[in-house]
């Protein structure tokens, strides 16, 4: 069958993000089906997408929904309207069944299925699409035995993440990369999936599971080298936390060096205390900056958030990164359950100890006024059985 995979993500702030997930999906089904990717960023608009659909005449159309909103209170924007417009374009130009997927879809599958009225949805990792395509091609209407697949008639059930290592043996066409190489020059790479941490707000475990599935370091290095050869000026490791496994991440860095990767890269890190020399070795491998998921410098709030570290670990991790000559950034999340003036004051008063750093603040709760800070509405938080979603 002819399968068209669409990335409707037009968000370009702070930079356009290459739709890596669709490459994984395309690679998983390419042996059995003809696959094409349509990315709205290089296409430019929905009219161009419509022309692409008519020329290709797909048998199945998949749309990957990456983001639900931009989490920016100063310039808030939701994307469901854009997704509706994308679906309308697909329906206008093709009678093919529509399959929804992606990280944003996985968080709210039933609501989005109802809103966008698709025939099918893929919850979790998109590589699950293969068995669904087989069923569609065979004309089967019974998909109840396919994990992670839902329809508007079949209610969503809990889905376990795929229990296997994901492939890295694809190389996207140069034509797909041109837009991103011209607009920032950054591409992306995964060295593992899953997250073992239990932060109460995080979506990674829900999408990828808690068990780490590691790419062999040599394979990760080969992929990084191919990104460089394709023209990337920089790449970002999209793991939940690159240092969630210190040993594996150190071996990945060693493999980068052996493979001759020469462009800089960055990644997300948990501010836990690293082994001696860890950040120095990563810097030698090209790491230019670390992005710490710190969230708070109040031990009380770190406990509430389910973080595997405390404030003194944050300071120590920051010192190690600076000592290695790296740039550092910290993300903070204000307004979690139990946040009050005292806990915010703890965070704000200790920030000065994080020298030479950039800080990004996000808010969680609704209009809570406290001294020196206003926590505005940003994300809707649902409380259910003591959990935060």
Can you name each region flagged by the protein language model?
Residues 63, 123, 237-239, 292, ...:
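Conserved beta-strand positions
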Residues 111-131, 284-289, 346-362:
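Structural recognition of alpha->loop->beta junctions
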Residues 166-329, 334, 349:
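Radical SAM [4Fe-4S] cluster-binding motif and immediate context
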